[in-house]
From Swiss-Prot:
Major localization listed first in the record, in broad terms: secreted
One GO BP: signal transduction
Keyword Signal: yes
Quaternary structure note: Antiparallel homodimer; disulfide-linked. Interaction with LMBR1L is controversial.
Keyword line: Disulfide bond, Phospholipase A2 inhibitor, Secreted, Signal
Location(s) in or outside the cell: Secreted
Signal peptide: 1-21
Family: Belongs to the secretoglobin family.
GO cellular component: cytoplasm; extracellular space
Function: Binds phosphatidylcholine, phosphatidylinositol, polychlorinated biphenyls (PCB) and weakly progesterone, potent inhibitor of phospholipase A2.
One Gene Ontology MF term: phospholipase A2 inhibitor activity
Name of the protein this chain belongs to: Uteroglobin
């Protein structure tokens, strides 16, 4: 649970940086695969960033948890992410 909260906070910070007018496409791709991709596609999206073994294990655990959510819950998460990105706070 702490890892999930940390990832959400970091993600929101990156999305809403005052100095940034764009969201990093790689981050969006990784988050999209976390929510809607297969475990292997999610792992593949992380490889360009050379995660160490602890990072791989942590993200694997997170993906396993996310995959227990219903399709409706996953869709709602993606919708919320888009609302956040498009909100005035992130403009």
């Amino acid at each position: 649970m702490k890892l999930t909260i940390a990832i959400v906070l970091v993600t929101l910070t990156l999305f809403c940086r005052p100095a940034s007018t764009e969201v990093c496409p790689s981050l969006l791709y990784v988050l999209g695969n976390l929510i809607a991709g297969t475990p292997s596609s999610f792992e593949a999206t992380l490889e360009p960033f050379s995660p160490d073994e602890d990072m791989k294990e942590a993200t694997s655990q997170l993906k396993t948890l996310v995959d227990t959510l219903s399709p409706k819950a996953k869709d709602s998460m993606l919708e919320l992410m888009m609302k956040i990105i498009q909100s005035p706070e992130c403009a």
